[in-house]
Amino acid sequence: MVKQIKDPIYEYVDIDDDFTKVIDMPEYQRLRNVIQTSYQALYPSALHNRFTHSIGVFHLGRKLFASFCKNVKSDFPLFYHGDWKRLEKTFLLACLLHDVGHSPFSHTGEKFYKDNFREEIQKRLPANIELYRDMEHGTGKPHEAMSAIVGLKLIRQLGISEIDEELFVRAIIGVRYEEKNDSDDKLIENITIGMLNGSLIDVDKLDYLIRDGYVTGFNTMSLDVERLFAGYTIADYIDPSASKHKVPAYKRGALSVIENVTFANDLERHWIQNHPSILYDAKLVDLAIASYDSFMKKKYKDALTEKTVFTQKALSLEGYIGQGVPLSLLSDEDIITYLKNGEDQSAEAVWLRKQYFDRSERLKPLWKSESEFSHLEREILGTAIRRSFKAALKAISGYAFFINESEMEKAVEQKKLMEEAALSEDEDLKNAAQTSLQAQEAVIRIFHIFNQFRLDMDLDFKFAFLFVEYHYESNYSKLQNSDIYIEFSKNRVIPFRDVLTVAAVQASEDEKNGYYYIFSSRKNIERMQEKGLDFGREILMYISRNWITL
């Protein structure tokens, strides 16, 4: 029996019995309460969740696989010796379950997962030595590995048969086969893995680009997936050494769509994901999750014996209920409820509650984009100061978010402890303390500069900063090294990098070191405006005059 789900983007999505059983499971329904992005701080309508996204990925996966299978059978009828039906079912289950292991607030919370996923996956597939070996190069992102583990559990629990469990795991975590035996079949299976977890274009990325654009209204361009999918196949490529081999390829009609997908991804990363309001909100969520984790482990220390509450068990319906802990199907609402109920009266929790729910308390950015920052930085700060100050900010970002009197006192106290350790007779401890002390002195200088600036300008000591490791670099640079090929004809298959029509935007070595946002209170911003001063420019000029490079 086929069930239909109404989707605002794809109209109706057909779901067969085995897939319906998966969707009905509590672990899958949990995804209704895991937000897809952190964009709602900037785009209030961005309320879509991992549930709807996963259904969308499943739908696109079915369409892409059907087109690919049809094209390969037509172009190379005897190439694949495996079972296409089994391959399709495995792939579609991976599409459906690829995010089932996401933590609360999606990517913001996944860093709290433990990092021994290779061993955890091996326990569930002990006979797959090849997979264990191939995982030496990585097991994907933390949520991908957790999704593979939870997904495998659900498949077995439901008794779903006629699938390749190893391929299911590989597709979710993006680990391709490296063994060259049965290379024809492995090529098809590796291409299938890339359809879900590719470097530049896959059904996961396509759905989130389309869906994010739909709910935010940030529609950069139309992504014609029908045209893209219709031209996906394999082709004979003759490399520079005159060796001929099969490669995944798109028909030439897909050229414009590939560029559009790359461009849409660039714009979303540059103008949405790294907008200061979104980064600020994500930082608050990050602090809230850490606070929740710490609170739960202290309150239920006898039952919660693992390093963190972010475990596979916490994602299940049973959870820790049997141990007297109100923790199961862990999702966003657990973190929100923790902030709302006020049970945790620690200073940090009280501050977080106020910051998260009262928007008037939030500090505002002094510049709104990386582009604006880069222009100001290049204009005002010399190269030596730029690098030295950025390095100090990067050091402070490990433990401080706010720049205020309280945080400055903590930094001074920490310096005293380092000074004591630097006098230790233990040489290792002494050397480590001396190295840390130099960095700490730069951190304290940052506090002093901001404190003196606010005194000179008659402002409150309320600042915050966020250091952003990412620097905008177009995905076109990745296309230059990608494994995407275009088939112009049977005898002319060209790497996509050779037909690029848009130049890659390259970051300088200095820019690759990251950038930062500085925030201050509305009151401070209004005071500077009353004085007719550009707050961002003034603070960078003050840093330029007073920062001495080490």
Positions of the model-derived regions?
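Histidine-centered, transition-metal-coordinating active-site segments
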Residues: M1-L93, V100-L550
